[in-house]
């Protein structure tokens, strides 16, 4: 790594630590020529993939869009932002690990619903009402009955 102060390439790593859910590595370095210290951050470059929307159009996967939809479902619920970020990262890494270059939105929606079901039942119903395009009160009754049956089993 080139020193930003003297442009020499003789540097040494003094300290390394993983940050942000182990997807970044922060390294403290020292230049062996001018003795300046500086910090670098390494990030794993993940492959990008596309999302196939219900109307057949494709668009690049947007992690922020996924986070926003989950934040809407969990608004004013006793769910930590840390828990939501972990969920978003887990979904992202699972999708990123798939062999396909394009993933349908229903696969992503199912993953979100599975995670929300474990995390918060009210957020699950909120998300389901949009994702499953609820038309009337019976749709809500059906999903709530499903939750009650799952808790009994």
Curated annotation (Swiss-Prot):
| Cofactor binding note | Binds 1 zinc ion.
UniProt zinc finger (unnamed) residues: 3-34
Domain named ATP-cone: residues: 49-139
Q: Give the molecular function GO annotations.
A: ATP binding; DNA binding; zinc ion binding
Q: Which domain of life is it from?
A: Bacteria
Transmembrane regions listed in the UniProt entry: none
Its biological function? Negatively regulates transcription of bacterial ribonucleotide reductase nrd genes and operons by binding to NrdR-boxes.
Do you know which HAMAP family this protein is assigned to?
NrdR
What the record says about family reads: Belongs to the NrdR family.
Classification via PANTHER family? TRANSCRIPTIONAL REPRESSOR NRDR (PTHR30455:SF2)
Q: Report what the protein is called.
A: Transcriptional repressor NrdR
Give the originating organism. Answer: Ehrlichia canis (strain Jake)
User: Its encoding gene is what?
Assistant: nrdR
């Amino acid at each position: 790594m080139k020193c930003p102060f003297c442009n020499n390439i003789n540097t040494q790593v003094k300290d390394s630590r993983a940050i942000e859910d182990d997807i970044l590595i922060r390294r403290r370095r020292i230049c062996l020529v001018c003795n300046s210290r500086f910090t670098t951050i390494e990030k794993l470059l993940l492959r990008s993939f596309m999302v196939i929307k219900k109307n057949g159009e494709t668009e690049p996967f947007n992690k922020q869009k996924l986070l926003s939809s989950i934040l809407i479902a969990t608004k004013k619920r006793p769910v930590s932002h840390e828990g939501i970020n972990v969920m978003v990262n887990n979904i992202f890494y699972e999708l990123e690990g798939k062999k396909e270059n394009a993933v349908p939105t229903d696969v992503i929606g199912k993953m979100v619903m599975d995670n929300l079901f474990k995390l918060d039942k009210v957020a699950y119903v909120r998300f389901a009402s949009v994702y499953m395009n609820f038309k009337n009160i019976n749709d809500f009754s059906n999903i709530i009955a499903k939750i009650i049956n799952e808790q009994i089993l």
